[in-house]
Structure formats: structure tokens, C-alpha cells
Amino acid sequence: MEDDSLYLGGEWQFNHFSKLTSSRPDAAFAEIQRTSLPEKSPLSCETRVDLCDDLAPVARQLAPREKLPLSSRRPAAVGAGLQNMGNTCYVNASLQCLTYTPPLANYMLSREHSQTCHRHKGCMLCTMQAHITRALHNPGHVIQPSQALAAGFHRGKQEDAHEFLMFTVDAMKKACLPGHKQVDHHSKDTTLIHQIFGGYWRSQIKCLHCHGISDTFDPYLDIALDIQAAQSVQQALEQLVKPEELNGENAYHCGVCLQRAPASKTLTLHTSAKVLILVLKRFSDVTGNKIAKNVQYPECLDMQPYMSQQNTGPLVYVLYAVLVHAGWSCHNGHYFSYVKAQEGQWYKMDDAEVTASSITSVLSQQAYVLFYIQKSEWERHSESVSRGREPRALGAEDTDRRATQGELKRDHPCLQAPELDEHLVERATQESTLDHWKFLQEQNKTKPEFNVRKVEGTLPPDVLVIHQSKYKCGMKNHHPEQQSSLLKLSSTTPTHQESMNTGTLASLRGRARRSKGKNKHSKRALLVCQ
């Protein structure tokens, strides 16, 4: 376990990745300025509002959308807690939010990347795959995050959770490009990470003199919201897309009429991300002081009012994770998170502590980062869980109690369903045959050979005799798991002839005499099967 920890050999180990400055909507990663746009682009995006028709052609498709897992692989229940290795609460809170991001978790659990990756050491996707797999498949346990997750970022003191979050997302995006070093910006935006978290801003400037229009498209992985004048996330989004007037000293130099003229600038979301990361700007860039105010955020958020195209229906997102900072400054305090497991239950993930929570408690936090997923995506993953598609962390035994044998054959070939079916059928046949044989034997007897008085006369005084139901007719009152337990017990319990072996009884009486003074009133239970 020490090899996987953040803290090794008395010092922090990190040197794999360079620190990333958090992304902002106005960061011009790629610009496309034109008055006329191409008819069609092969960039794969959601067809929800034909969001990619106006973007530049793509030289290479790095992660086709059809390769994303279509069914859920995540266990329905909550996973493991994370050990704090010393000022790493910001790491743990961020990792938990990523772990419970359905599209990312499903891809990681499919192990598709690690099967084709040729540089496992230093690859953030491989590192995150190992972490997410361990976290989701170890419910009730506490695990240590790998040292490679914070390599190049952690300096032994508390850092900003949002910066670490985007550092990790960006490192995963770069890991998608090992064999595609020389690709254009638009091809890079077809990676797996961009398909999950990414979209495009459209900054449109309209000249009020000649009515010429210039569009600039910038990719995003998160959305930063100014909350100083906002009481809710919706108000912050409205302020973000509010048209801005450009005049006077800020007048626009139009490329159409070739003169400085007043103009209006509007920022809208041109493409909708599968998963939205909304960052509430709570910390001052200068002093680091925190804006400790309550900002309301909904469980369901309609993003359609903030999109470039307004002629379509609602675009509903549902909340699935919240990252919270408790404290008065970005330099101190504590980070924790709330996540929604695939079963629908909310949990508070506070380092090693994992406790059930409610949506009321989740919505009352002073949130720092909000995670939303498209409602259609969440429902699709939830439906697959209800059909029993997720692998169980506790192994095949636990799975076979929750899924039918047909489901195991269809959805879990790794569980070797045919052998499991044969074993269960054989076991059921043995149990049925034994009961039937005992019933026939009992019918042919005029008087039972075995009765309570004979047993009590030969057993030591400190043995309490418990008789099991002869034909298990009382089993119908038990729960299914109790019935299964009793069946297993009856199959492994020796017959009464073996239990009444003379040597065994002599040994019991000898042990009873030796311990008589020590355990005068104790009783030992002996299960007798008839």
C-alpha cells in the first residue's frame, strides 16, 4: 500500500506533470473568426442542437463518440473513502467528484485505454483508471490515493481544489494524445475528455454600423461564474450571457466596414457538454479571501436559455456532485464533497468518512464547484443499473444474489455463468433428493429411532440441543438469504448417526468435567438434524 500512497519514504514524491492554470471562458485556446461558416463539420458533438455545424473541419478523430461505453459498468453503491495524507483534502474531494462522473467512470472501468496504452507509467488516464477501479470496488474501505495523481502539483500544503481538478482533467486530456503530437486544435477537441467535459463558447460581435457579424469559438472544460452580484447559479449564468455594448474607447474595429464603430458582444454556449463543471468564483485573485455567501443552485438546471440556438426544447442537467470549501480563505480551511451514487443516494465524502446524506443537505452548502450531467445521460445509466448490468465489487457470490442467471450470462461473461448455473442446479438437485429420501424413510417407520429423550440422556449436561425442522416447512417464514444460509448449513451438518459416535460423546464428557469449575453455568449448543 505504501507504493501507492502520496507520501513515501518521509518525503513527498512528485515530478510527472507541470502545474496547470485553471481555465476561464475568455481563454482563447482556439479562434475561428469568420462571417461565413462551413456547411458541415465532422467534429463529433451532441446532435441535441446541431452544435457543431459551424466549427472548422477536423483533421483527425481521436476518440469517436461511438467508442464511449453505452451501458453502465459502475457498482450501484457508494465506494471507498480516501485517506488524508497531510493537507490533501483538496485532492480527495476532487477525486471523489471525478470518480462519480458516470461517463468517465464507465470508460475507466471498461479498461479500454490501458489495453492500448504503451506508457502506463506517467499516464494520467492509466493512473485515474486504477484509482477509480479501486475506489468503486472497495465499498466500506479506506484507500490511499496514488502518489502519481498529485505528482507535480502537491507541495505539502493545501492547494486550490478547482485548480487541482482542472490540472487532472487537462492531464487526462493530454494522455489521449501520445501518438498524435502534431494535431490541430480541433482534432484535440475530439478526445475522450473533451467529449465528456468539453464544449464551445461562441463570442459573437455585431457591428451596429454595417451589421457585420464576427463569431469566435473557444473550447471550454469548465465554466467560471461571478457570484458577487448573483444570488443563484441561474442569475450568474444570465449575467454571463448578457450582451455587452462596445463603444467609445472600447469601440469595435469592424473587419467588414473597416472602421471603428459601436458594436454589441454576446457570449453564449454554442455546444453543450455532456458533463458541466460550474465553478463559483469564491476567492479573490489578489488576496485569496473568500466570498462566504449562500448562492442557490438547483437539483435540475435548464441550460437552454444560455445556448446560442434558442429554437429547441429544454436542455436539462441534473446535479450529481458538489465540491465544498469550509473556511475563510483559499490558503486554509477544509475541502469535502457530496456525490450521488448510481443507486440515487447522496453521500458526504469527507476524506476517510463516507456518510449518507440527503438532497436537502446537499443543496444547503456553500458550494465551490458544481457538477451537472445531462438528464438523458443520467437516466440511461440509471436504467442499466436497474437491469443489473453493473459488476459487483464483492465478487460473483454477491452478484448471483442480485441478478438472474440469464442476466449473468448476457451481461457478465467474466463471471462464468454456465459453470455457475450447473453448480447451482446440481446443488438444488441434491437438496431436493435428500429431503425426498428422508420423507420416504420417515413414512416407512412405525416409530422413530431417534428421539429427544435418548439424545438428552447421553449428552453432557452443558449441551443445549436445538432441533432443526425436519422437512424445512418452516423455511417459508424466513427471508431468502436466511433460507440460503440454512440450506448451506444443512448440507454441511453431519447426520445424527455421525453426531452420536461413542468416541465423540466420551470426548465431550471429558472436556465438560475439565471445564466444570470455570464455566459452571455455560451451555454449548448442538444442532441436531432429523
Curated annotation (Swiss-Prot):
Active site: C89 (nucleophile), H334 (proton acceptor)
Signal peptide range: none
Annotated USP domain residues: 80-375
Any single GO BP term: protein deubiquitination
Originating organism: Homo sapiens (Human)
Bias type Basic residues, positions: 510-524
Localization per record: Nucleus; Endoplasmic reticulum
Cellular component aspect of the GO annotation: cytosol; endoplasmic reticulum; nucleus
Biased composition (Polar residues): 496-505
Known EC number: 3.4.19.12
Protein's UniProt name: Ubiquitin carboxyl-terminal hydrolase 17-like protein 22
Bias-annotated ranges (Basic and acidic residues): 382-392, 398-412
UniProt-annotated stretches for the region Disordered: 382-412, 476-530
